[in-house]
Amino acid sequence: EVLEIGPGSGNLTAHILKKKPKKFYVIEKDNDLSSLLSEKFNDEINIINNDVLKISEDKISKEKLTVFGNLPYNISTEILSKWIINLNKEFWFNELVLMFQKEVADRIIAKSNTSNYGRLSILSNWKLNVKKIIDIKPESFAPKPKIDSTLLVFTPRKNFFELKDPRNLEMITRIFFSQRRKMIKKPFN
C-alpha cells in the first residue's frame, strides 16, 4: 500500500499508479487540487483532503505504507519531526521516499562534528536509517524552483533507544542547536 503526500496535480501519482499498488492513498490539503485528482484518477486513489500535520498516519491503513512525497518545502521539517516524534515501536510505514530542499537534506544526513549536524540529524537518525539517493537540479521541474532538491529514503531502525517522552529530545536539541555559537552552558541559565 502506498501513501503520497502533497500530490499536487498528480504527476508523481500517475507514475506510482503504473506500479499497480494494492491501495493508494493521497493526502492533499488544497480543495481544488483534491477535486482535480478525483476527476483525473477516479477510483484509483483514496483522497484524504486534509492537512498532513493534522492527520494520524497510523490510522490510514492497517498495512504498513510506502510513503512518497515532494513535501512542501516550507513545512517539510515540521512534517518529518512530527512523524519521528510520534513513531511507536510499530512503524506505520516500510519506507519514506521524500524530496527535500537540498539544504534541509544536507542537515538531515549530516554526520556528527560537521557544520550541518544538528537537531534534524539527531532526530532523523534516532529511529530511522537515512540514505541520500540523488540531488536534483531545478531544471528537472516545471515550474522550475529556485533551489536544488534532494531525494532521501528513510527506513525504520530495528533498534533504537526509547524515550518516555520523545518530545523532550526534540525540545533539547532545538535549545542546544539554536544557540550553536554560544557557550554550551547558556541554554541551562
How should each PLM-predicted stretch be described?
Residues 1-167, 171, 175:
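Catalytic cores of RNA-modifying enzymes
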Residues 156, 173-189:
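C-terminal lobe and adjacent flexible extensions of AdoMet/dcAdoMet transferase-like proteins
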